[in-house]
């Protein structure tokens, strides 16, 4: 019975505090590469999803809303490894959005969402063994990092003509992380702790254009206004005598040197660790006023000049990302008396390729998404 309880606890811990493989590449795993941005848009980031002519990830469509909208999305992610019976998963708030349309011509919106997940824990499998002074010594290394970046997003739209609409989104990035590099020498841990603070500013410009026969064309352009800066503080090396991972006074053993005997090194700044640029194109076709087919393509590049000066768990980073998406959606009709007409459906397929900057290897991902909703009334919950 006790063994079953222990196995259950270990399973829950691995489910709650696990990691994805891409967390160890570069600054961490970008949530934009993880899956859907929010529960309403599905795989779409430009084309309509649950409402005709509206995508909550595309500010140039916000003025088409009839009422103010508040959206909260919660997501989970699971990563499995080929040839291994391992499944890593984590979950959390994926997006909180508030949009206010103004006279069907303008709109403003505010949202907050996670941007990068930096959680990773690596332990070297190969332990170095050697004999010295008639004693067998073992050396192994480990790397642990936690934290990440959030994005505070402020957007607006303006209907230029009956067929052309413009949108803009400013992404204020901020966050922090902590990492420990440890060398275990025959039961004794020597640890180097580093703390980092991040801030940056990215802008996105959007265009929506109505063509003939219910065909819509979308595009967006991403430009970095202020590259993400890393303020890094390296702590003094210490011997973790009590094996708790912290530089402290906990008994029965005391870490060496004592915490009050040393000071941290001076904080230094790395001014350009994330500098993305990219563009997106999309096209959608409305059928019978309640169905939509859409295709989207995007490409993004990492133009950082200082990214290589940061210690990574894996000595690599994503230099280029290309994605292709196709989706099929059904809009809900809140005025219909038929229950089936009040149900919205969104589904899609996604293909992404990530080119690594150091080795130029390519990681390929294939994904699918399906979701549904129910419209209770014109103004209300869904």
Description of each model-found segment:
Residues 1-4, 18:
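Short, low-complexity interaction segments enriched in Ser/Thr/Pro/Gly
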Residues 10-18:
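Hydrophobic h-region of N-terminal signal peptides that target proteins for export
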Residues 3-11:
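Sec-dependent signal peptide recognition
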Residues 17-116:
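N-terminal, post-signal peptide beta-strand-biased segments of exported outer-membrane/organellar beta-barrel
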């Amino acid at each position: 019975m006790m063994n079953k309880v222990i196995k259950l606890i270990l399973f829950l811990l691995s489910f709650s505090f696990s990691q994805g493989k891409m967390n160890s590449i570069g600054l961490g795993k970008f949530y934009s590469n993880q899956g859907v941005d929010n529960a309403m848009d599905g795989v779409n980031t430009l084309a309509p999803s649950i409402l005709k002519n509206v995508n909550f990830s595309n500010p140039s469509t916000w003025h088409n809303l009839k009422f103010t909208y508040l959206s909260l999305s919660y997501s989970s992610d699971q990563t499995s490894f080929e040839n291994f019976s391992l499944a890593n998963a984590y979950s959390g708030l994926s997006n909180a959005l508030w949009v206010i349309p103004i006279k069907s011509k303008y709109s403003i919106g505010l949202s907050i969402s996670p941007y990068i997940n930096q959680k990773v824990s690596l332990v070297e499998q190969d332990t170095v063994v050697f004999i010295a002074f008639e004693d067998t010594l073992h050396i192994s290394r480990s790397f642990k990092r936690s934290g990440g970046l959030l994005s505070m997003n402020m957007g607006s739209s303006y209907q230029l003509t009956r067929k052309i609409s413009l949108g803009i989104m400013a992404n204020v990035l901020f966050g922090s992380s902590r990492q420990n590099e440890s060398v275990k020498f025959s039961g004794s841990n020597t640890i180097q702790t580093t703390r980092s603070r991040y801030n940056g500013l990215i802008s996105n410009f959007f265009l929506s254009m109505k063509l003939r026969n219910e065909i819509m064309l979308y595009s967006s352009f991403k430009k970095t206004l202020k590259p993400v800066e890393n303020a890094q503080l390296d702590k003094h090396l210490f011997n973790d005598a009590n094996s708790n991972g912290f530089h402290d006074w906990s008994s029965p053993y005391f870490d060496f040197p004592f915490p009050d005997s040393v000071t941290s090194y001076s904080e230094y700044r790395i001014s350009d660790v994330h500098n993305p640029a990219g563009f997106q194109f999309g096209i959608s076709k409305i059928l019978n006023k309640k169905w939509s087919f859409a295709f989207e393509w995007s490409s993004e590049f990492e133009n950082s000049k200082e990214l290589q000066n940061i210690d990574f768990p894996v000595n690599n980073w994503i230099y280029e990302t290309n994605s292709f998406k196709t989706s099929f959606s059904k809009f809900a009709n809140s005025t219909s008396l038929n229950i089936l007409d009040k149900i919205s459906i969104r589904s899609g397929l996604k293909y992404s390729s990530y080119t690594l900057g150091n080795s130029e290897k390519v990681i390929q991902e294939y994904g699918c998404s399906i979701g549904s909703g129910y419209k209770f009334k014109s103004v209300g919950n869904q």
